[in-house]
Design a protein with these regions (language model features):
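Surface-exposed, glycine-biased beta-strand/turn segments
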Residues: 10-113, 142, 194-195
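Short strand-coil-strand connectors
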Residues: 51, 90, 118-120, 167
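Histidine-centered divalent metal-coordination motifs
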Residues: 82, 128, 159-163
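Short histidine-centered loop motifs in beta-beta connectors
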Residues: 95-96, 105, 120-143
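Short aromatic-centered micro-motifs
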Residues: 96, 117, 164
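Short, surface-exposed secondary-structure boundary micro-motifs
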Residues: 107, 145, 150-151
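Short aromatic-glycine-enriched beta-strand elements
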Residues: 110-116, 158-160
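Acidic, glycine-rich catalytic/binding loops that coordinate metals and/or anionic ligands
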Residues: 135, 142, 163-195
Length: 195
């Protein structure tokens, strides 16, 4: 958690020896001391920029083609729960959303080629990849490419299927997308206030 505080102003102080007459204050002696180190505003800007860069969407552009929840299954036509979000994609790099670790890389009939990342109590899986770019155990930073979108596994066409779990329980990935959006908006607003 980052906090930002204003640095107190410093004033020039002159020690008087016993018996000396106190000099009259001048405008120069009353002025705040000039900062010689890094300016607090520059430090604040760096903090907000670092915070902005601490999160990323999994693709450069986000267009949800199938949301989380119940839907008509594209293979059976029956109502079925969709445990992730499908994003429109065409041969794009899949990016880590936050700092984390690659905990699983695999391939199966349903998810096709996939990679799973752990971000604290969250795990995020990116499925139907044409290629996985990260190995198990790799530490990733936000915006690190972990795969390339594709249409492997049980898929009707190229897209990115994103699933998310919190403490092992399936949750709607839009929770993370909303967090990323609010974090980036907060940072942009704070930076605009510093200009």
């Amino acid at each position: 958690f980052n906090t930002i505080a204003k640095t107190p102003e410093r004033y020039k102080v002159e020690a008087l020896q016993e018996g000396m007459k106190k000099p009259e204050p001048t405008p120069e002696s009353m002025a705040p001391a000039q900062e010689t180190s890094t300016k607090p505003a520059d430090e604040s800007k760096k903090l907000w920029i670092d915070r902005y860069l601490s999160v990323s969407y999994p693709l450069q552009r986000i267009r949800i083609t199938s949301p989380y929840g119940y839907r008509k299954d594209p293979f059976t036509g029956k109502r079925k729960f969709h445990g992730g979000i499908d994003l429109h994609a065409r041969g794009e790099q899949v990016l880590a959303m936050m700092e984390g670790v690659v905990v699983k890389v695999g391939q199966d009939k349903t998810s096709g080629k996939y990679v799973t990342l752990r971000h604290g109590n969250y795990t995020v899986s990116y499925c139907h990849l044409s290629r996985v770019l990260a190995a198990k155990g790799t530490v990733v930073r936000p915006r690190d490419a972990v795969g390339i979108t594709g249409s492997t596994g049980r898929s009707t066409g190229e897209h990115l299927h994103v699933t998310c779990k919190l403490n092992g329980k399936n949750i709607n990935p839009s929770v993370l997308f909303d967090y990323i959006k609010s974090m980036q908006q907060e940072c942009v607003s704070a930076l605009a206030g510093l200009l």
